[in-house]
């Protein structure tokens, strides 16, 4: 049995979890509402303040989706209570970020500023060279952070570019030069 899948999910006060007949799990909380369709190989049982995920059978697919489904539901519960965030840092001369309403405007050395609209439910916080992406959906927060990082990935010689705050860039030595 999946070690992750068999752990029950604690549902905090102020959060409601509903499952309909099509295995669509809906979680409502103070930071919003999230829905996820769960595979038919697993079932979702709500027992008071806990949610348990069980397998229908012991097939290879059911075992594979058991832990995944439990993690997806647990992330939804965490998202509507605490939310998720990713922090990006910009290194480079003239690299800057500003907010224009809800839109993120990035100056990344191109001939034009790059405008990034937030995904549904996400929001941006900006310091001079730091961008924080916040939202209840872990997948959307991570996806938006990856797409922003992709605009100017960090390069190994000078370290210029956009990187995650906890990412370590492996630096390379420059040319050896003539002697």
UniProtKB/Swiss-Prot annotation:
Any single biological process term in GO: cytoplasmic translation
Residue ranges of coiled coil: none
Gene Ontology terms, MF aspect: rRNA binding; structural constituent of ribosome
Assigned keywords, A-Z: Ribonucleoprotein, Ribosomal protein, RNA-binding, rRNA-binding
Disulfide bond positions: none
InterPro entries: Ribosomal_uL6-like, Ribosomal_uL6-like_a/b-dom_sf, Ribosomal_uL6_a/b-dom, Ribosomal_uL6_bac-type
SUPFAM superfamilies from the UniProt entry: Ribosomal protein L6
Record's GO cellular component terms: cytosolic large ribosomal subunit
Record family assignment: Belongs to the universal ribosomal protein uL6 family.
Summary of the function given for this chain in its UniProt record: This protein binds to the 23S rRNA, and is important in its secondary structure. It is located near the subunit interface in the base of the L7/L12 stalk, and near the tRNA binding site of the peptidyltransferase center.
NCBIfam families associated with the record: L6_bact
PANTHER family in UniProt: 60S/50S RIBOSOMAL PROTEIN L6/L9, LARGE RIBOSOMAL SUBUNIT PROTEIN UL6M
SUBUNIT field: Part of the 50S ribosomal subunit.
HAMAP family membership: Ribosomal_uL6_B
Name of this protein: Large ribosomal subunit protein uL6
Organism (species): Herpetosiphon aurantiacus (strain ATCC 23779 / DSM 785 / 114-95)
């Amino acid at each position: 049995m999946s070690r992750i899948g068999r752990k029950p999910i604690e549902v905090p006060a102020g959060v409601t979890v509903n499952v309909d007949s099509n295995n669509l799990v809906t979680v409502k909380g103070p930071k919003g509402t999230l829905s996820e369709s769960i595979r038919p190989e697993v079932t979702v049982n709500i027992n008071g303040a806990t949610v348990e995920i069980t397998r229908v059978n012991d097939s290879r697919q059911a075992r594979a989706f058991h832990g995944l489904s439990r993690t997806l539901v647990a992330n939804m519960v965490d998202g509507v209570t605490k939310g998720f965030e990713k922090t990006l840092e910009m290194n480079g001369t003239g690299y800057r970020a500003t907010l224009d309403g809800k839109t993120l405007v990035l100056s990344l050395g191109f001939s034009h500023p790059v405008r990034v609209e937030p995904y549904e439910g996400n929001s941006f916080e900006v310091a001079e060279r730091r961008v924080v992406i916040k939202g209840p959906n872990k997948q959307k927060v991570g996806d938006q952070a990856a797409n922003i990082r992709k605009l100017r990935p960090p390069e190994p010689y000078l370290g210029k570019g956009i990187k995650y705050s906890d990412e370590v860039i492996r630096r390379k030595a420059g040319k050896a030069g003539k002697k």
